[in-house]
């Protein structure tokens, strides 16, 4: 049974991959949001949402391999991603169609160029998801924030629209070992172990970053997000 569900997962993305040429970018973004919601429903992943997003850089916490499905089910947007993903047969063309900011993480020149692009990014016209932690954190925790999105908001004048979301199943944790897990192994674990989870999502109040305030806003957002995570990200039986 789990093998059938795994095949459906790949069919899901293959279909999206084949549909890339037939939609405008805006139509494709709406399609992804619709499909992500259907995929979550199929796997009994109930998503509870409070609040509505406002225009700006979309900043969220990062815990699980399920995070991309959750955020795209709420609001489809691009993301900052390592350039290798662009060459993935299924995910690369889909991501490029949505609108990505590609970066070679081991290349200082590429990282600098990505920061410059981020500073000039129109976050209202082209929604962009950013995980300020830069990596996944353990279930119930929140890692330190990198300053990229906060500096970009300061330089561009765009608001930061934070989203904090909390799972109630520790098995979705992608950061407990402190090392990056293999994506495809995680997908196999999800189906083999029949992992189900609820997700509690909170659109927080947008934040303005004034001149010289990037660090201050980053610290304040981290403090606020951590309150939600420690309150709501708990195993279901706790």
What is each stretch, according to the model?
Residues 1-62, 70:
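Membrane-anchoring hydrophobic helices of lipid-metabolizing enzymes
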Residues 12-22, 53-108:
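Catalytic core of membrane glycerolipid acyltransferases/transacylases, capturing the structured
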Residues 96, 118-120, 175-179:
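Short low-complexity, flexible loop/linker segments enriched in glycine and/or proline
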Residues 101-122:
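A membrane-cytosol interface segment of integral membrane proteins
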Residues 121-150:
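Catalytic-site beta-strand/loop segments enriched in glycine and acidic/polar residues
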Residues 140-213:
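A cross-family acyltransferase "interaction/gating" segment
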Residues 196, 200-238:
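Long, non-transmembrane cytosolic or organellar matrix-exposed soluble domains/tails
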